[in-house]
Amino acid sequence: MNASKASKKRKAVTRDVEEEAGVFSGDELNADNLDGALSDNANDLSSDEDDSDSEIELVDEFSEDDEDDEELDSDEIPSDGEDAVKKKSVTTTDKSGEIAEDAESSSEEEELDFRIEKDANGNDRFIYDEINPDDNSEYSDVEENSNTIGDIPLSFYDQYPHIGYDINGKKILRPAKGEALDALLDSIEIPKGWTGLTDPSTGKPLELSQDELELLRKVQMNEIPEEGYNPYEPTVEWFTSQQEIMPLSAAPEPKRRFVPSKHEAKRVMKIVKAIREGRILPFKPPTEEDKEEDNVINYDLWADEAERPDHIMHIPAPKLPPPGYEESYHPPPEYLPDKKERKAWEEADPEDREQEFLPNDFGSLRRVPGYENFVKEKFERCLDLYLAPRVRRSKLNIDPESLLPKLPSPEELKPFPTACATVFRGHKGRVRSLAVDPSGLWLATAGDDGTVRVWELLTGRQLWSVKLSEEDPVNVVRWRPGKDALILAAAAGDDIYLAVPPIVDPEVEKASLDILDAGWGHAASVPALTPAEANKKNNPPKWIRPSSSLQESGVCAIIPLRYIAKSLSWHRRGDYFVTVCPGSSTPASVAIAIHTLSKHLTQYPFRRRIKGGGSPQAAHFHPSKPILFVANQRSIRAYDLSRQLLVKILQPGARWISSFDIHPTSSTASGGDNLIVGSYDRRLLWHDLELSQRPYKTLRYHRKAIRAVKFHPGGRYPLFADASDDGSLQIFHGSVTGDMLSNATIVPLKVLKGHKITGELGVLDIDWHPREPWCVSAGADGTCRLWM
């Protein structure tokens, strides 16, 4: 306000005020009793106290608290604009005449800003004029958007054009809403403090002040809204951090801290007594019958929950690969890097490393420390999940049968043996070996009874028999190749017997005897051994003549090997045959022997044991090359006899090789060598020497060990078979072509069953007819069977 307006005085008529209840004394309040109490204003008010008009000067220097205590003798409630009148407070009395006189006497002062009217009861009512504040008035600071209707929801006036009433009872009209043009202008030029919201108390647009905007900015920026607040005030140690040596209290520990409580013991005994009397029963879960009696209903919150279908573009995240052995806290030694590998890993760039860590051996799980790259790996996994694009790969609907090779039907591959035609009975005990002669007329068998028998193949009639040993079984029997002579070789005990059965024409029999007798003259021409050579242990044996009884039976020569031979194989020309003694007590230098029929000569080609794979098991000559194949327990070696060199080593992968056979057309029309190998671990393996040292095919069709395998001789029929201890034979089709780009075709054809399993042994040997698709098998049940 201006100084002139501030210095103006205003007179008002006082009225009698009743005594308040809070005043205990009956004396009136007198100015004399306040002597010295208001010493600061005593001089200023001394001149005014003597005035006879009893004027009360209301100066702006009075405090607002004193002004608020004054009451208005009016029926109206002052409005917000009328609050400024309190700065010029006027106290009036109930006498209107005095007011009028005072108003006339104060002509120098302003006219009063109210008028007096009569209300309905005839009392005086003061009506104040509206205040028009100017720039010099503090009423200009009234907030324009302030709520003047009180705490009343605006929803009460939704059906009315106004939103409430002001202090004088006038309707406050609803603020006009901006049209589309105003909204466009507001969006272009955003006014200061604009929020785009509506104040629910006034219905007007909500505008924020600068302080409120600053408060919101601090909250958004995670700053402290309050000014002057220090979040890092020094710590106040309410409890000292210094450890005291002496206790604060030296009182001894009370006895109640280490003595059981008697009151608790009494309560426990009461509970125990109640349990014993049956008044307290242990909790038992209610049965379903009790629940039904109590009508207990259990509601399943997720009973009707339906699975939410995934979004049409949802692609599940790819799963992480399972951990390997290198991620174990105690990995195998082969996974642990050595110093060289560790140094190479540390010097390599992180992008060039095969793995992000080096395997370590901690011994036990409790010694495993924290993984330092755990957070990094999880973070990279999260990056891959939400940043890397995903592609839905359509699964290939492939019929599993289409992946199998298309094999011809067995009906198209006939002929092959399908049924048993003849059964040969006569041996006592197991029949260990058999062989069909090159003409296909006779069958020779050998068994545990020490005899060799010759049968007519088609009829099953026994034609000849000879007993070679009383104690030892005959392990193997083989016919000499060629039709010009008929010579049978049999291994019984430590000896090899060469016989000519008297079942053929005299001409063939004479030719056979001449071949055997020619060797005696050559053996006689060999110079005798020196005493030094005679003292050697492993000298080649000399062929001897049999006893007279054996000679009458047809045995012509005996080769004393001194060790048990279990494998015998002829060369294709019929002048050589090789024997193998697989016993563990057999010296390595005499385990394999090559015998020359025309010279009655025995040679030991190996002076040392074959490296790796154990003792030798079988040996065969190549059908067209001077190559000898020798099989030990785990490998097969090919030796060139002309050059005396090791040609190739085959690794079938079997634990124990039992037998093997060479394809009869190897290196002729087929363009390569093919072998089949049988093993005691139930595997039948096909080897193609041109492909690899490993087997081309591995067949596992038997439940027990495979004893013998055999190709069809001559190559007329692409058949081969195997014999197993499970009492069955399996016939296969195995065709080999001369095309180097095509592999052998192997088709299972037939499973032949007829032999009985005796002593955990089944079929012990097998052989083919030289011209027909017939095969003959020898069983542990003492019989042989012809399959046609």
Curated annotation (Swiss-Prot):
<dbReference type="GO" id="GO:0000466">
    <property type="term" value="P:maturation of 5.8S rRNA from tricistronic rRNA transcript (SSU-rRNA, 5.8S rRNA, LSU-rRNA)"/>
</dbReference>
<dbReference type="InterPro" id="IPR012953">
    <property type="entry name" value="BOP1_N_dom"/>
</dbReference>
<dbReference type="GO" id="GO:0000463">
    <property type="term" value="P:maturation of LSU-rRNA from tricistronic rRNA transcript (SSU-rRNA, 5.8S rRNA, LSU-rRNA)"/>
</dbReference>
<dbReference type="InterPro" id="IPR001680">
    <property type="entry name" value="WD40_rpt"/>
</dbReference>
<feature type="repeat" description="WD 4">
    <location>
        <begin position="652"/>
        <end position="697"/>
    </location>
</feature>
<dbReference type="GO" id="GO:0070180">
    <property type="term" value="F:large ribosomal subunit rRNA binding"/>
</dbReference>
<feature type="compositionally biased region" description="Basic residues">
    <location>
        <begin position="1"/>
        <end position="12"/>
    </location>
</feature>
<feature type="repeat" description="WD 5">
    <location>
        <begin position="701"/>
        <end position="742"/>
    </location>
</feature>
<keyword id="KW-0677">Repeat</keyword>
<dbReference type="GO" id="GO:0030687">
    <property type="term" value="C:preribosome, large subunit precursor"/>
</dbReference>
<feature type="region of interest" description="Disordered">
    <location>
        <begin position="321"/>
        <end position="344"/>
    </location>
</feature>
<keyword id="KW-0690">Ribosome biogenesis</keyword>
<comment type="function">
    <text>Component of the NOP7 complex, which is required for maturation of the 25S and 5.8S ribosomal RNAs and formation of the 60S ribosome.</text>
</comment>
<comment type="subunit">
    <text>Component of the NOP7 complex, composed of erb1, nop7 and ytm1. The complex is held together by erb1, which interacts with nop7 via its N-terminal domain and with ytm1 via a high-affinity interaction between the seven-bladed beta-propeller domains of the 2 proteins. The NOP7 complex associates with the 66S pre-ribosome.</text>
</comment>
<feature type="repeat" description="WD 6">
    <location>
        <begin position="758"/>
        <end position="788"/>
    </location>
</feature>
<keyword id="KW-0698">rRNA processing</keyword>
<dbReference type="InterPro" id="IPR019775">
    <property type="entry name" value="WD40_repeat_CS"/>
</dbReference>
<dbReference type="InterPro" id="IPR028598">
    <property type="entry name" value="BOP1/Erb1"/>
</dbReference>
<keyword id="KW-0853">WD repeat</keyword>
<feature type="repeat" description="WD 2">
    <location>
        <begin position="469"/>
        <end position="509"/>
    </location>
</feature>
<feature type="compositionally biased region" description="Acidic residues">
    <location>
        <begin position="99"/>
        <end position="112"/>
    </location>
</feature>
<feature type="compositionally biased region" description="Pro residues">
    <location>
        <begin position="321"/>
        <end position="335"/>
    </location>
</feature>
<feature type="compositionally biased region" description="Acidic residues">
    <location>
        <begin position="46"/>
        <end position="82"/>
    </location>
</feature>
<dbReference type="InterPro" id="IPR015943">
    <property type="entry name" value="WD40/YVTN_repeat-like_dom_sf"/>
</dbReference>
<feature type="repeat" description="WD 3">
    <location>
        <begin position="611"/>
        <end position="649"/>
    </location>
</feature>
<feature type="repeat" description="WD 1">
    <location>
        <begin position="426"/>
        <end position="465"/>
    </location>
</feature>
<keyword id="KW-0539">Nucleus</keyword>
<dbReference type="InterPro" id="IPR036322">
    <property type="entry name" value="WD40_repeat_dom_sf"/>
</dbReference>
<protein>
    <recommendedName>
        <fullName>Ribosome biogenesis protein erb1</fullName>
    </recommendedName>
</protein>
<dbReference type="GO" id="GO:0070545">
    <property type="term" value="C:PeBoW complex"/>
</dbReference>
<dbReference type="GO" id="GO:0043021">
    <property type="term" value="F:ribonucleoprotein complex binding"/>
</dbReference>
<comment type="similarity">
    <text>Belongs to the WD repeat BOP1/ERB1 family.</text>
</comment>
<dbReference type="GO" id="GO:0005654">
    <property type="term" value="C:nucleoplasm"/>
</dbReference>
<dbReference type="Pfam" id="PF08145">
    <property type="entry name" value="BOP1NT"/>
</dbReference>
<dbReference type="Pfam" id="PF00400">
    <property type="entry name" value="WD40"/>
</dbReference>
<feature type="region of interest" description="Disordered">
    <location>
        <begin position="1"/>
        <end position="118"/>
    </location>
</feature>
